[in-house]
Amino acid sequence: TVNNGNIQENATEQTTDHAGAIIGFKTQRGEQVHARIASYFISFEQAARNMKELGNDNLEQIKQKGQKAWNQVLGKIEVEGGNLDQYRTFYSCLYRSLLFPRKFYELDEAGKPVHYSPYNGQVLPGYMFTDTGFWDTFRCLFPLLNLMYPSMNKEMQEGLINTYKESGFFPEWASPGHRDCMIGNNSASVLADAYLKGIKVEDVKTLYEGLIHGTKNVHPTVSSTGRRGYEYYNKLGYVPYDVKINENTARTLEYAYNDWCIYQLAKE
C-alpha cells in the first residue's frame, strides 16, 4: 500500500489522507489477467454491493455497454449541416460537459440512493453530487441539463437540498465539500432556473429557505459560500471597493442577478 506517496511493504491497509495500493500478478508470456475492483465511500459491504453492478461481464462487454449508454445520452441531441470534424468537436464537447457534476451517492441493498456526506461525515439517505463550480456552470451547463436531461438534473437538485440540510448552505463550489474559490451566490440561479423550468423538487420550502439564508450569511470557514460582503450589499446595494473584500464589482453583479433569480422563484 501507499501512504502519502510512500510505499509501505507488507501493509494491506492504510488510514491517511492520501492512500493507494499496488497489485502485481505473476503471469506467463501472453497471459491475460482480468481483475475486478470495487470502490466505495461508505463501507466494505457497500463495495461488495457496488461490485454487483458489473455482473459476470468481462472487460469487452463492459466497454460495449458503456459505449451504448453514452450513445443514448449523447444521441439526445442531433446536429446536421456540418462536416465530420465539426460533428466530432460538438459531441466531444457535449461528452465533456456531461462528466460533471459527479455522482457522490451509492445504492443500498434496497436499491435506494444513500451517500456519505462530505459536510458532516455521516451516511445519509438521498442523492449527493460534487465536483462542480456554479461560478462557471450556472451560465450554460445547468440550463442545458434543464432542457435536455431533466430527470438527471432533478436528482442533482435534490442533492443540493441535501447539501443545505447537512451543512447549512447551498454549495457554490463542491469538491467534494465546500471549497473556498470563486465568487457569487449562483446556487440561486441553478436552483431557481430548474424549478421554473418544471423540475419540481418535493421540499421547495427548504429550497427557498436555503436561498434566503444564503443572501444574509457567509460560511464561517469557507467565505466563498453564502455571500461575502452581504452586510454592505444588503444595505448599500453594492459591495464597496474599500472594505477589504476583493472582486467588489463582480460580486455586486453576481449578487444582483442571484437576487433576480430568487425573486422569480418567489413569484412562482
Model feature map: region roles:
Residues 117, 126-134, 138-139, 145, ...:
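Long, structured ligand/cofactor-binding scaffold of large enzymes
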Residues 1-33, 40-44, 51, 152, ...:
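Active-site cavity-forming subdomains of large catalytic enzyme subunits
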Residues 56-63, 79-84, 130, 143-146, ...:
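Hydrophobic alpha-helical scaffolding
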Residues 65, 69, 85-92, 139, ...:
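Extracytoplasmic/secreted proteins, especially bacterial periplasmic and envelope-associated proteins
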Residues 92-106, 130-153, 192-197, 260-268:
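Alpha-helical support elements that line or immediately flank enzyme active sites
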Residues 1-129, 169-172, 201, 205, ...:
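Acidic/polar, glycine-enriched structural segments that form the non-catalytic walls/loops
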